Each structure stands twice: as C-alpha cells, then as structure tokens.
Amino acid sequence: MELTADRAEEILAAFAERRVLVVGDMTVDEHRIGSATRISREAPVPVIEQSGHMFLPGGAANLAFNIRALGADVSVAGLVGDDNMAGRLRAMLDSAGVHTAGLIAEPARPTSVKLRVWAGGDRQHQYQQVARIDMVNRDPVSEVSQQELILYLEGAVPEYDGVLISDYENGVVDEPVLEALLPLAARHGKFVGADSHGQLHRFRGVEALTPNQPEAEAELGRSLHEPVELLDGGAELLRELDCRRLLITLGAMGMAVFDNEGEARAIPARPVAGVADTTGAGDTVAGVFTLSLLAGATSAEAAAIANLAGAIVVTKLGAATTSPDEILARLVEDASAAE
C-alpha cells in the first residue's frame, strides 16, 4: 500500500509529541573544506587551500540532533572528555534544544573527534572527501563512569517514550550498560531500538534494529546482494535476533523492512539529484524510523518515511538533518512527478 500524503502528515505531526532518550557513543564531526589547487611536491597528494571549517554533532549526538530537528523532545546519555571538544559538543546540542544532563565527563578519555577533509576544484560544484582522521579512544570505560551512566539511565528511562541505542563500538554501550538498560526499559514497557555498527546479537530482543547491509551480512555470515538472498536473510535475522522490526539499509539500492507480523519487502531508493555526502545518513534513517513507529506507523509506513528522509540528507554536506515539512514536501514532489 502506497504511503499517502495525508497519512504521512498524520505520522509526522505526531513526532512533536514524542520523547526519546539516545544512548551511545558521542563524537564531534570536524569538517575542513577547500579547493584542490595542485599536487604536493612532498608526496602524491593534493594540496588543499582551506576556505571553510565547521563542527557538527557526530555519532549518537548526530542521531539526537536529527531527532530534535524532526520535532521530538530528546536527551542524550553517554561519555565525553573533560576538554574543549566536550564543551563544543554540549553547546551545539544545547543550542538545538537537546538535553545534555546525561553526558558524563571522564577526564582520562578525550572526546572522540572525526575529521573529514573536503576538496573541490574551481570548476567543481560538489566537494569530494579526500581524507578522514579518527581521534577515537576505544579503551574500556572506567567502572566509575559506567556506574554514573547507569544511575542516570535508571532515573531517565521511565520519563521517555522510547530509548534509541547508537553503538559505534567505542566502548560506551558495553555489557554492564546493556545489562542494566535493557531490563530497565522492559520493566517500564519502553520501546527500545538499536543502530549498531557490529555484533547485532548483543541487542537481541529489542523492538527495532536498523543495520546496514554489510552489518547484516556480517551477522548472518553470508551475502545479501540478490533479492531472494535479501528477503530470506532478513527474515532469518529477524528470527535470530528476536526483534519485532528490522530495517536493513542498502545504500543506493534503498532498504528492506521486516517484522514479526509477516512484513518483508524491499523499498527502492528515492531518486537523488547529486549525492553530496552520506555521512550520518544512517542516523537520520534510524531516527525517522523510530519516531514513525512511536507515532503509530506500521513497519512499512515507517520505512517509507525513513527512505524519504535518507534521500534528503545525502544531498547535504556533513552529518545533516531534515524536518517533517521537508519530508512531506519531498513525498508530494515525488507523487507529482510520478503522475
């Protein structure tokens, strides 16, 4: 069944009534932008003359940023350092209206930063990412910080409609935190979704999972490239992970959605006029899918809205966001073009 504009508007309007707690690995995304003017004499690499420099929330912070831009009330819970980048991240989130009381400072653990360098020649209208440098600490989290985070979660989880876990495998969403969080959410009847970059089995039993194709393939141990492989593999993964809903993102091929009520379908990607950057697109999809489900959408409806959102943000540079108005406008535009 096609998603109508009226139904989409009903779902999107309900976003503003939802409260979501995002738990996971917080990072700062740093972007340096310039023109590639020549090849260096020191090595066969381009020389970039910088013309722009910006910072954006990354990782779980970007997921929260997206959810806030969609109109929902959102808080973050995770670890940062006791440094300038932590202050910058707090300021960005605070200015967007994201609640940051759950950010725990661990002085011995610098705030994670991911630096991307973008270059475009004088005649180029789009920039290309030419380098990425990750400054990420994956050391085990201290027991003191773990307990402080768990204590915060015990007080916060009952106050929210749902919890969305954003796991970049940087150490925050480790076993002690999961062993406290999942039963806590279950006791209070809270929705739990997870967007994990690996080891999907650690999130067995959650309401919704949103892996990309390589992550799903790694969990299953086989390819999902052919349509029959995708549909069979997705259904198997749904059963193995004992979750109610599974959304597998497929990059330029779109996505596939499965649920325990028999839904199993591939959704083609929306047309995109020039991909600027895929950074954070998975966060947008996870946020929109989760909010749509919390707003009463079916799995297929939630996936269709998430598909629209993903097509919007990949046309923007950096870990971008979208809004309900922008999503609805894109749906109407696509419907008009199809007539």
Question: Can you annotate each of these PLM segments?
Answer:
Residues R38-A43, V206-P214, M253-G282, L328-L331, ...:
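Flexible glycine/proline-rich, aromatic-decorated loop/lid segments
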Residues M1-A14, P183:
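Short coil-to-helix leader/linker segments, especially the first N-terminal amphipathic alpha-helix
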